[in-house]
Amino acid sequence: MSSLAAAHATNAVNALLQSVLPGSASVNAERKKTSRDKGSKAQLIDRNLKKRVEVQEKDVYRIKKREKKMLRKKISGRKEVQEDIEQKAKLQVLRKHQVDNSLTDHEKSYLDKVVKKNVRNLKSWDYDDKEELLDLQKQILANSEDSKKVRKVKSRRQKKKQFKEKLPQSIQDHRYKALTPGLAPVGASDEEESEDEDEDY
């Protein structure tokens, strides 16, 4: 069957499905069967093995990269140690020459460079220490100011609480038992008071 005939047949089937069952999914002629896409079991196993090999190769690459990095660190550490030993040996020779007063001009200039470098390093450390001290001082001052405020509030609350506890119970309850909120004695009404006043006149 040609592709043109297959397309016409597919369109006819889709039109029929739409008229009989509106909203149904249309048929796609170009869609391959899922079994063809997946392939046989041997092909699946082959694909999985290839993926596994790729992953292992990536892991091997990462491991080699990590090992190279560690090797570079070791080599650089050894170089630093070697340079440090050479530097100390040079300085010992220069000290001997300095004690013997047999320093050459080249050795004097080298010593001057070393001294200047060490002085710069010390000054930078002093500067860093000063900055750290200033930061620490600011932090301590900020904390102490905050703590002062908190202490003031707590002391005020504590004083109020102690003052209220020291007062006798009769003073604390400042309301009078015989009077109502309108200041009339309990149980008395306005009519009784007015009768009492009339009798007095």
UniProtKB/Swiss-Prot annotation:
It is found in: Nucleus, Nucleolus. GO terms for cellular component: nucleolus. The keyword Endoplasmic reticulum does not apply. Residues 29-40, 164-176 have a biased composition (Basic and acidic residues). Keywords: Nucleus, Transcription, Transcription regulation. Residues 189-201 have a biased composition (Acidic residues). The keyword Transcription regulation applies. Its main location: nucleus. Disulfide bonds: none annotated. Signal peptide: none annotated. Residues 24-43, 147-201 are annotated as: Disordered. Residues 149-163 have a biased composition (Basic residues). Involved in ribosome biogenesis, probably through modulation of rDNA transcription. Belongs to the RRT14 family. This is Regulator of rDNA transcription 14. It comes from Kluyveromyces lactis (strain ATCC 8585 / CBS 2359 / DSM 70799 / NBRC 1267 / NRRL Y-1140 / WM37) (Yeast). The lineage of its organism: Eukaryota, Fungi, Dikarya, Ascomycota, Saccharomycotina. The gene is RRT14.
